[in-house]
Amino acid sequence: MRFVKTYWLEMLMVIPLLAYIIGFTLLPILTNIKESFIDQRFGRRYDILVSKIADITYDIAHAYESEERRAYETERAEAALALERLQQSPYAGVSLSNYRKLFTDRSFINAIGNTVAITLMGLALQLVVAMSIALLLSRPLHGKGLFRTIVLTPLGIPTIVSATIMTYIFDTSGYLNEVLYKLGLLGEVPIDWAQGGWLSICMVVFADTWKVLPLMVLLFIAGLEAIPHSVHEASQIDGSPPMYKFFTVTLPLMKPYITMALILRAIDAFRIFELPLILAGTATTPLISTFTYSEYTRQNYNLSAASGTILTGIILIFVFTYLYIVERDREPNA
């Protein structure tokens, strides 16, 4: 009670956020997990079974006298009641059939492979480019403010708008094919970047890199500015070459920031949705997120729930890894 009297205002202010988290995050996730274990065919089999029992018992009853007919009708009613109780049971239709179906579905296996490929390729490209830009912006340069504004511009553009912009670049009649044609690197037939395979994966990686690069640049700039000037001065006194200084001094001190950036980007990359949906669609280059959406639009709700549950589990692994690293780095300073 003393705690409530002391912090009643803080608790009152937390209630809206707590209600939002429970109502719009926790409950949907738990409902999705529950639905992923329900066999969608159970309800159909139940209806068919009830219908067959009714037909059989009715036909048999007509073959006997009224007294025996009443006995069969009683058995029929008891059977229907037992089936109704079975359907109302919380364990009715519970099985792993949706997960078995997913891991035998070639489209879902391709979706996992495409998601992993986009994540790994995107992380590698974004790490190199973001670090290079951060190193450039951390130095005194003329027009650095303008260049920083240009670099950070994609951060304020909605993802759907970014995807629409990218369609003007990667369309068969887009700017990229036009440039390749002018350079003599492309014949009369334009490249269909959305045809699937590695072309579509590279297209999504490039679009995603352009969209999220500012966030990684900001993280790396913060890490570079956190390095004490005395460290740089000591390496300059030693006469270390710039590359040697980067790999032996700057990069080790940037390790916590790089780790956090990679984990956060991995979480975001696994749940990427709008860019691949608009650029590549769901048929040629399925990802886990777009596969989940596609199955939902086909009214395969339980299969979609199972796919979403798998995606949630993967993301939670990255989240717990992130929290573990944060706590581990905090302990020496405690």
Please report, for each region that a protein language model flagged, where it lies by residue:
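A structural signal for multi-pass alpha-helical bundles of membrane permease subunits
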Residues: 2-92, 96-334
